[in-house]
Amino acid sequence: MLGVLRIQGALASAGQARLLSVRLLASKSTTDMTTNRGESTQSTSTEHFDIIIGGGGLVGTTLAAALAKNSTLADKKVLLLEGAPEFRGFNPTGPYQNRVSAINHNSIELFKSIDAWKHIESARYKPVKQMQVWESNTDALIQFQHDNFASDVACIIENDLILDAVYALAKESPNVEILNKARIQCVRLPRDSNSNHSELQLEDGRNFSCDLLIGADGANSVVRKEMNVDVFSLNYDRMGLVATLELGEDACDNSVAWQRFLPNGPVALLPLTDRLSSLVWSTTNEQAKMLQALPPTEFVDALNEAFCRQYPRVELADKAVQALNSLFGHNGSQHQVQYPPRVCGVLDKSRATFPLGFLHASSYVCNGAALVGDAAHRVHPLAGQGVNLGFSDVRYLVESLAAGAYAGFKLGDKQHLIKYERKCLAKNVPIMLGVHGLHTLYATQFSPVVLLRSLGLQLTQNLPPVKNLFMRGAMGQ
């Protein structure tokens, strides 16, 4: 959930943060690759491109569109390798989909710069005007109001609508070629800046070479493995459950994002329309499977209970929160939890689950290659930052490539690509550590930890300048 990521990241122990920072560089990830293209059943001829993007999806396709729209890079020949079949488009009058993203200000500005935002804006999206995050073991909460910022807290947009906008831009560009059902089998990268091009072979035997290979191929990136960079990853042993929900008649102005930290993980409700919301519920693997299998009426009852149920209280933490509010001269009514509109239904076949984890590559670049999106980093969805970090990668990489091309650098020159990496690491690592710290803080019911996180949340609520600072960071401003 936006806004929470930095609120308590500082509350995680300094020792843990230092340990994570070191371990980001600690776990070696290597792989043996077969580079003998003579074994292919297809022709061994090799087609050359200036840039090849290995992997499509939201980030890879947005990158292709951004490269095509950049005037300095407009003459570069780009190949987008998409593992999925050809995208069939998005129907703005069809049912709402369960895969949505909370898009922040910076990502929206990126879409505007490549002329994708007008396509999204003319279809459908929902601005988030307010947000509330609250505890289940105490009365600690934090609330954000749209009035405190120059722009909306976020915009909730279906993933396929974003893909529809950027895919159309990439497809209509004369210098971008899109190849569907294209999966990379093996990669060979240049050893140094004076070596030959990057080369790859697809599973169907086709061969390509390029000046710069960009890995946008997800958490199991083939490109990253061939780069032989250190990778730190964690399996949270948790699942995320998504669904599209119908709201009761009391949802007259559904523009608030809600998130409650439950004992097994956070549950979030994101507005889609006045009568529809999107669910992201992080919980144990067992509970996620159980929730997915429940009949619709029982699932709705379980969800409403999750938002309203009184969980066992931590008395010491509760008293500390009350004392903190009194110290700032606030009574209970001024900091009282508001509850989301009641859910009355779940759209058919909208429930789905996905595994949760953490991943970070120690380096995003090498000679002839660079990483973006989930190929470089993966975070818990509780802060809504995952895809926004990927879009930030796109912006930094295109800016760096354009500056390098203007200065006469080769596209795959690591000495210039390293500037992209430094910008990304400076932005991504603090956010990722903050998100991981939040996950760790809320994964335990140990009373001293509950006290610590509750005080941190309530202290931020009582200090508007600090609260606004955190929120602007989460919004990308």
Curated annotation (Swiss-Prot):
Pfam families: FAD_binding_3. Its EC number is 1.14.15.45, 1.14.15.46. Its cofactor is FAD. Component of a multi-subunit COQ enzyme complex. Belongs to the UbiH/COQ6 family. FAD-dependent monooxygenase required for two non-consecutive steps during ubiquinone biosynthesis. Required for the C5-ring hydroxylation during ubiquinone biosynthesis by catalyzing the hydroxylation of 4-hydroxy-3-(all-trans-polyprenyl)benzoic acid to 3,4-dihydroxy-5-(all-trans-polyprenyl)benzoic acid. Also acts downstream of coq4, for the C1-hydroxylation during ubiquinone biosynthesis by catalyzing the hydroxylation of 2-methoxy-6-(all-trans-polyprenyl)phenol to 2-methoxy-6-(all-trans-polyprenyl)benzene-1,4-diol. This is Ubiquinone biosynthesis monooxygenase COQ6, mitochondrial. It comes from Drosophila melanogaster.
